[in-house]
Amino acid sequence: MAEAPLTVVIDPNVLVSAFVSELGVPYALVSAWVARRFELVVSPELLAELREVLSRDKFRRYGSDAEVEVFLRRFATARLVADPPAQRIVAADPDDDYLMALARCAKADYVASGDRHLTQLEDAVPPVLSPRAFYELLAEQLNWP
C-alpha cells in the first residue's frame, strides 16, 4: 500500500516567489504539488493574503491581472481548510500565527516558509522548513531530483 503524501502549508511569500520566477525552489515546489508529490493545504486567509500581495504595484511587472488570476486558480485544487480560530504562536511576528494555526488544524506534516520568525521556532508543531529544505526532503523521500 502506498504511503499517503505529505501534507504541507506553504507560506504565501514562497508562492509569490513562484509567481515572480519560474527559476528556483519556490516554483519547483509548486510544480511538485501540481504533479501530486504532496498535498497542499490552503485557507481563505492564506489565499486572500496571496491575492493581496500579488495585486501590489511592485508585482505588476511580473504578470498581468489575468496572469495573477490564472496563478490563483491553480490553488482551487488544493485542500481548502476553514480559517482556524486565532492562536498566539509566533511571538516575534503575530501575523504568522494563522499559518501555524492552519497547519495544526489541518494536521499538516510541515510548513514551508522562508520567514525567519517561523524557521527559527524551536520545537514547532508541525516543523517549519525552508523551501529548499522541504524540496530536499521531498527529493529524498520520493527519490527524484
Language model: regions and residue ranges:
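Hydrophobic/aromatic ligand-binding patch that stacks against planar heteroaromatic rings
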Residues: 32, 102, 120
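Short, well-structured N-terminal submotif of metal-dependent ribonuclease cores
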Residues: 1-42
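Short secondary-structure boundary segments
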Residues: 12, 44-45, 114-116
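PIN-domain endoribonuclease scaffold, especially VapC-family toxins
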Residues: 32-86
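Active-site neighborhoods of divalent-metal-dependent phosphate/nucleic-acid chemistry enzymes
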Residues: 77-111, 116
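Acidic, PIN/NYN-like endoribonuclease modules and their adjacent C-terminal/linker elements
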Residues: 106-112, 116-145
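Residues at secondary-structure transition points
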Residues: 24, 41, 63-66, 90-97
